[in-house]
A protein has these predicted regions:
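Conserved N-terminal beta-strand and adjoining loop/helix that marks the start
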Residues: 2-23
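A conserved beta-turn-beta hairpin within the catalytic core of GNAT-like acetyltransferases
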Residues: 31-34
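A short gly/proline-enriched turn/hairpin at secondary-structure junctions
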Residues: 37-38
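Unchanged
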Residues: 44-138
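Charged phosphate-binding loop/patch that engages nucleotide di/tri-phosphates or the phosphate backbone
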Residues: 129-156
Length: 156
């Protein structure tokens, strides 16, 4: 099946802001470069977006103590580069179409734990939102530029 005929995976993404309006990013364990991303993941069958968002956030970061500031109305998507199609998601999808949420972290940093059942991140940090496009893999850069506009509407 040609790449363009593969469906998009339905997912969620989570923008987690701390009290200084910095954004949580994690360093993926399967990417050896110095690339960081915000938590994201797939929506399970029968699951709504908010439930999926909360589940993914706990699965990846152990973060439970959040307040939803905004459910972004637009669905954003990205396509995988050709060298990753067929490898990621067992070759079933060509990219991901995501519902994003902007949240406020109400807890303390020591509540963040990456040593979860199926760890995806090996490190994490808080960064300034304007640095997001510089830390993400190239094929998600346009997505992160759009998300930066959404973040700026909330924190300005």
């Amino acid at each position: 099946m040609a790449n363009h005929q593969l469906p998009m995976r339905t997912g969620v993404g989570i923008i987690v802001l701390n009290n200084n309006n910095q954004v949580f990013v994690g360093k993926r364990k399967d990417n050896p470069g110095d690339k960081w991303q915000m938590p994201q993941g797939g929506v399970d069958k029968g699951e709504d977006f908010i439930t999926a968002m909360k589940r993914e956030l706990i699965e990846e970061t152990s973060i439970k103590n959040i307040k939803i500031l905004k459910e972004i109305q637009n669905m954003y998507q990205y396509e995988l580069p050709n060298n990753l199609v067929g490898i990621i998601w067992k070759g079933k999808f060509r990219g991901q179409r995501q519902k994003w949420f902007i949240t406020k972290f109400l807890g303390k940093d020591d509540e963040i734990n990456l040593d979860t059942q199926n760890p995806e991140f090996i490190d994490w940090k808080w960064i300034n939102p304007q640095d997001l496009p510089d830390v993400i893999v190239d094929f998600k850069k346009e997505l992160y530029l759009n998300l930066l506009k959404e973040i700026n509407q909330v924190i300005d």
